[in-house]
Amino acid sequence: MSLTETIEKKLIEAFHPERLEVINESHQHTGHQPGFDGTGESHMRVRIVSSAFAGMSRVARHRAINDLLKPELDAGLHALAVEPAAPGEPTRW
C-alpha cells in the first residue's frame, strides 16, 4: 500500500470525512534537499471536511491529524500540509 493510500485509509477510519483529498506534492520539492528527487512520497497535502472537527479549534484539528499520522511522519514523511474544515465552513479548495 502506498503512503497516499495509507494516509487516506487512516483518515477515513478516524474522521469519516464528507470530503477528502490526499495530494502528493513531492514533485514540487525536487532538489530541495539531497534525496528529494520528486518521485517519492515525501510531501503531502491533506484536505478534509469532517463533522469530527465541529467545535474544534484550528490548532486542535491539526494536532488530531498530526497525532494520527505520527508513525508516517516518524518513518520519513517530510512535510504534511493540512487543510481541515467542518461541514459548512468555507474552504479555499
From Swiss-Prot:
PANTHER family: BOLA-LIKE PROTEIN 1, PTHR46230. Signal peptide: none annotated. Pfam families: BolA. GO terms for biological process: iron-sulfur cluster assembly. The lineage of its organism: Bacteria, Pseudomonadati, Pseudomonadota, Alphaproteobacteria, Hyphomicrobiales. Gene3D superfamilies: BolA-like. Belongs to the BolA/IbaG family. This is Uncharacterized protein in cobS 5'region. InterPro entries: BolA (IPR002634), BolA-like_sf (IPR036065). SUPFAM superfamilies: BolA-like.
